[in-house]
């Protein structure tokens, strides 16, 4: 496997990928993502509903954008090492049924690739891809304990609400 240090020499590509392709490769990143941001990990375990994701993908609702380091390949036509993703859903909003909204499910960039513009470029690609699908408004959330809101402010997004969470299980 060829290797390249992340950073300026890396060639990061952004693309839409099918669920089955991206999900299989994303397992390691998903666990790392969960370890980094999830609250109540001792009570609520990561258990991805693969069937539901596949159903949403089959219906054309799910959109997966991946970020890959093209310098790290296993073989000649390998698209590169998966270093990040954005999973979103394209749906009419329940209050605005005539308009498509892009709703972020999750997004993640491997920590080694967070310096520079990788996150900004990922969301620029997401914006373009969603717009091409007819989306008129994008919605996402950030964790307060891992706040990356400055990326969205830079991209012209507006902070519009706060959400609250409370564990009420046993």
Model-derived features: where do they sit?
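Conserved beta-strand-loop-alpha-helix junction that forms the acyl-donor binding cleft
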Residues: 138-149
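A short beta-loop-alpha structural element at the N-terminal edge
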Residues: 10-28
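A short, internal acetyl-CoA/4′-phosphopantetheine-binding micro-motif in the GNAT/acyltransferase core
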Residues: 105-115
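Glycine-rich phosphate/pyrophosphate-binding loop shared by adenosine-nucleotide-utilizing enzymes
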Residues: 72-85, 102
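A conserved beta-strand-loop-helix scaffold within acyl/acetyltransferase catalytic domains
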Residues: 44-64, 69, 86-97
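Conserved acetyl-CoA-binding loop-helix of GNAT-fold acetyltransferases
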Residues: 115-128
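Conserved GNAT-fold acetyl-CoA-binding loop/helix
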Residues: 24-27, 31-53
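Conserved catalytic-core motifs of GNAT/GCN5-like acyltransferases
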Residues: 141-142, 158-169
